[in-house]
């Protein structure tokens, strides 16, 4: 299942040759901008994490929980079609956040991040931050095709969504440097099979770290924090090619 971008485009029955050329050009331009962003992140000294998932899986809640660790400093770029509600939630926790509203776009692109980054820098001194989280638009499809220059890609899967999503949306989970099963305390109420998730993830992409989180269990959030800190200390850079 580990297909290159060109192979994925060529295997798409909804795209003709001309459409493939257009999409390929758009994605290539995004790649160039994403590489420029990587250099910008280095200059700012921030380690960048791209959070992806379905809507309502708990991305913002995870960030709220991480904000409780006072030695874990970060700011956030929030992606949604409309409203600044998620940015407001984080600001209420003392986190500097800038909301990107995409209109009808189902993902964030590198050019959007570039513009928003300038705005975020007006709100906070990013050189005093250890991390920048990019909370992508809630969608298990489109964000998997657009590089935003992040060093670490984390995908959330919430228990109410069901345990069958990994092989249904393989392109998304192929992006993952780690997978978080969120709302894990509700697993029993939804008949969610952790065994199935592990098997499907192992079939798709072996050795991907898997975390179970619950907003009620601080230790589960601490494990995610520790993982991110470890990756930053290693200067880990995702090997995934969008």
Swiss-Prot record:
MF GO annotations: GTP binding; GTPase activity; nickel cation binding; zinc ion binding
Residue numbers spanned by region G-domain: 48-211
Ligand binding (Ni(2+)): 106-107, 142
Keywords: GTP-binding, Hydrolase, Metal-binding, Nickel, Nickel insertion, Nucleotide-binding, Zinc
Gene disruption: observed consequences: Strains missing this gene do not produce hydrogenase or urease; addition of Ni(2+) to cell cultures compensates only poorly for this loss of function. Normal amounts of apo-urease are produced by the cells.
InterPro entries cross-referenced by the UniProt entry: CobW/HypB/UreG_nucleotide-bd, Hyd_mat_HypB, P-loop_NTPase
Transmembrane segments: none
Amino-acid positions noted as binding Zn(2+) in the UniProt annotation, renumbered to this chain: 106, 142
GO biological process, one term: protein maturation
Bridged cysteine pairs (disulfide): none
Record flagged with keyword Nucleotide-binding: yes
General function of this protein: Involved in the maturation of [NiFe] hydrogenases. Required for nickel insertion into the metal center of the hydrogenase. Exhibits a low intrinsic GTPase activity, which is essential for nickel insertion.
Annotated family: Belongs to the SIMIBI class G3E GTPase family. HypB/HupM subfamily.
Protein name: Hydrogenase/urease maturation factor HypB
């Amino acid at each position: 299942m580990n297909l290159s971008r060109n192979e994925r485009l060529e295997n798409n029955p909804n795209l003709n040759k001309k459409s493939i050329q257009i999409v390929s050009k758009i994605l290539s331009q995004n790649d160039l901008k994403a590489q420029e962003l990587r250099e910008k992140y280095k200059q700012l000294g921030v380690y960048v994490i791209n959070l992806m998932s379905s809507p309502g899986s708990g991305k913002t809640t995870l960030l709220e929980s991480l904000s409780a660790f006072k030695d874990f400093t970060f700011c956030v770029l929030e992606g949604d079609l409309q409203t600044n509600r998620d940015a407001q939630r984080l600001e209420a926790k003392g986190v500097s956040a800038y909301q990107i509203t995409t209109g009808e776009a189902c993902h964030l692109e590198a050019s959007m991040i570039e513009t928003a980054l300038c705005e975020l820098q007006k709100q906070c001194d990013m050189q005093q931050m250890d991390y920048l989280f990019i909370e992508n638009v809630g969608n298990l499809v489109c964000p998997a095709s657009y590089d935003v220059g992040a060093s670490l890609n984390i995908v959330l899967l919430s228990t109410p969504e069901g345990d069958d999503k990994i092989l249904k949306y393989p392109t998304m989970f192929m992006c993952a440097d780690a997978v978080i099963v969120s709302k894990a305390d509700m697993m029993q109420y939804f008949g969610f099979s952790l065994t199935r998730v592990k098997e499907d993830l192992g079939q798709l992409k072996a050795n991907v770290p898997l975390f179970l989180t619950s907003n009620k269990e601080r230790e589960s959030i601490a494990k995610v924090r520790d993982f991110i800190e470890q990756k930053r200390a290693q200067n880990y850079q995702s090997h995934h090619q969008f």
